[in-house]
């Protein structure tokens, strides 16, 4: 299961602790009936200044919280895509990767696919074209 999430929660005022707790609860629910299920948490992506202006620091802190959570939780992997969308932590996203300043466009999704593929298909010769 891949989670690509977090930005709407930040926009609605949830704290990083609340957000991580919500995802922990979802994971625990699934693991109760399927303990071998694997999870990937994709980092919360940055936005352009058009969306959630001033929230870049919160996005960075949420990603650190997700990473810590994944490091201590069995069968959960944190994958960084933030770096591909942003020059450095705390700055706004490259606008050419987002359709509206918030959601990835085709080029942005291709970038995500390239980043996720090794985690989803580690034993194959699958190539993205």
Regions found by a protein language model. Give the residues of each.
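Glycine/proline-rich loop-helix segments at beta-alpha junctions forming the active-site rim
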Residues: 31, 40, 56-57
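Sec-exported extracytoplasmic/periplasmic mature domains
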Residues: 6, 15, 24, 28-35, ...
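Catalytic His-Asp segment of secreted/periplasmic serine-dependent ester chemistry enzymes
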Residues: 45-129
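Short, flexible active-site loop motifs that bind/organize anionic cofactors or intermediates
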Residues: 9, 29, 99
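Charged helix-capping and loop-helix junction motifs
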Residues: 16-26, 56-63
């Amino acid at each position: 299961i891949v989670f690509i999430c977090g930005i709407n929660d930040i926009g609605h005022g949830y704290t990083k602790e609340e957000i991580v707790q919500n995802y922990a609860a979802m994971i625990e629910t699934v693991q109760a009936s399927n303990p071998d299920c694997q999870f990937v948490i994709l980092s919360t992506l940055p936005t352009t200044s058009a969306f959630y202006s001033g929230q870049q620091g919160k996005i960075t802190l949420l990603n650190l919280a997700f990473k810590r959570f994944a490091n201590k939780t069995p069968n959960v992997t944190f994958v960084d895509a933030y770096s591909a969308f942003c020059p450095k932590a705390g700055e706004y996203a490259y606008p050419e990767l987002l359709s509206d300043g918030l959601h990835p466009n085709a080029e942005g999704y291709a970038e995500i696919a390239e980043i996720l593929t090794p985690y989803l298909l580690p034993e194959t010769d699958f190539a993205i074209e």
